[in-house]
Structure formats: C-alpha cells, structure tokens
Amino acid sequence: LAKEEQVTCDFQVMDAEHLTFQDESFDVVISRNLTWTLPEAAQAYKEWSRVLKPGGLLLNFDANYGATNFAETSDLPENHAHNQLGNSLMQECEDIKRQLPISSYLRPAWDVEELGKNDMEQISIDLGLSKRVYKERDEFYNPTPMFAIAARKQSNS
C-alpha cells in the first residue's frame, strides 16, 4: 500500500507490549484487532502511552472477542473465511483465546479503566463501528461487534 500510494514508510515488527521506541516519539498510535490477542494487554496500553507525545492520540479498533466462541461457526455465512479453516483449528483458536486474561474482561469498559491508569484522557468509545464497516455478510463479516476507542495522552501543561 505504501508503494502504491508513493509514501515512504519504515515498517518494523516488534512486541506491542515492549516497544523499542523512545518515550514520546509519536503523535498517533493506531491498533486494529490486536489488543484482544495480547497476553498482557495492560502492558501494551502502558507502552502505547509511553511512546505517545503529550496530547498524542491513541486509536484502538478491537472487539470483545473473549465473549465469542470461535468454535461455533454455524451463524457465519457459508463462504466465510472461518468455515474454510476446519473445526479442529477453530477449536484450537478458541482454546488459546480462553487462556488470555483479556478474554475474561468486559470490554471496552476494561480498556477505558486501563487507559485512565496510563495518563490517557478524553476517552471516547464508538460502539457502532461494525454497523458501518460490515454492510453485508460476506466472507469477511465479523459477527462480534467491533468498537473504536479514541484517547489523548495528558498534556504536560
């Protein structure tokens, strides 16, 4: 996409819970469908706040996947990607997800609480995201309602 848009980007792969960036390096941090997969999601929020500049914006697009049974695919469209994976793989995904602490939290309420502990303010939640993103039940349809969180790091002033 960067090449297509003729934009220079420095893509890096690293642990979201232990970033190698300097403190206050970024104006914006964006995450999509990541937080729910992290063994220590609270640590990730701490790191994301650390690398944000004062007044910087955190945008997190995620869902309360812990409340969803991945092994249950009967409600998905026939051509849905999860139906191509097979029952044993979907059950394995379910088993792994159940081991993650975040899967037992009520989200996004938990996220708001964690962000407040990490110098984040002006926290807003958009619970209507899925209705705008998933207009039809195609192979990419996600029955778990997504949410968007926007929060600003407290200014130094």
Q: For the regions a protein language model found, what residue spans apply to each?
A:
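Class I SAM-dependent methyltransferase SAM/SAH-binding core
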Residues: 1-18
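A short acidic, Gly/Pro-enriched loop at the edge of an enzyme's catalytic core
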Residues: 14-29
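A short SAM/SAH-binding and catalytic strip from SAM-dependent methyltransferases
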Residues: 28-42
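A short glycine-rich, Lys/Arg-flanked "PGG" loop and its adjoining helix->strand segment in the class I
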Residues: 42-57
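Conserved class I S-adenosyl-L-methionine
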Residues: 57-89
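Short glycine/proline- and acidic residue-enriched helix-loop micro-motifs
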Residues: 90-102
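Short alpha-helix
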Residues: 101-126
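Core SAM-dependent methyltransferase catalytic element
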Residues: 118-119, 128, 135-157
